[in-house]
């Protein structure tokens, strides 16, 4: 294989790898943005169900929502 052919293959591989790096960086940026949106949404849900504090666990939100839905179901039965 000639030296020029090897250089061309290596150059093509470099271009491919740079493209993959850029794609990965774009994907990471999209995922970070999506993560921020989801965090904000969870924070809103937590506030809506009365959970406050610096550290909020998803399990706490789930439990609070379960309790609220159970209370709503009980109230609906009582009204019947």
From Swiss-Prot:
Membrane-spanning ranges: none
One Gene Ontology term from the biological process aspect of the record: virus tail fiber assembly
| Keywords in alphabetical order | Chaperone, Viral release from host cell, Viral tail assembly, Viral tail fiber assembly
Check the UniProt entry and state the signal peptide residues, or none: none
Q: Which Pfam families match?
A: GP57
Q: Which cysteines are joined by disulfide bonds?
A: none
Among InterPro entries, the record links this protein to:
Phage_Gp57 (IPR020159)
Quaternary structure, per UniProt, is: Homotrimer. Homohexamer.
Purpose of the protein: Chaperone essential for folding and oligomerization of both long and short tail fibers. Required for the assembly of gp34, gp36 and gp37 (components of the long tail fiber) and p12 (the subunit of the short tail fiber). Together with gp38, participates in the formation of the distal part of the long fibers.
Identify this protein by name. Tail fiber assembly helper protein
Q: What organism is listed for this UniProt entry?
A: Enterobacteria phage T4
Biological classification of the source: Viruses, Duplodnaviria, Heunggongvirae, Uroviricota, Caudoviricetes
| The encoding gene | 57
């Amino acid at each position: 294989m000639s030296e020029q052919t090897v250089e061309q293959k290596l150059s093509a591989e470099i271009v491919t790898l740079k493209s993959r790096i850029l794609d990965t960086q774009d994907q990471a940026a999209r995922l970070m943005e999506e993560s921020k949106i989801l965090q904000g949404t969870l924070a809103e849900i937590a506030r809506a169900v009365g959970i406050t504090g610096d550290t909020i666990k998803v399990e706490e939100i789930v439990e609070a929502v379960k309790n609220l839905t159970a209370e709503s179901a009980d109230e609906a039965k009582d009204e019947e």
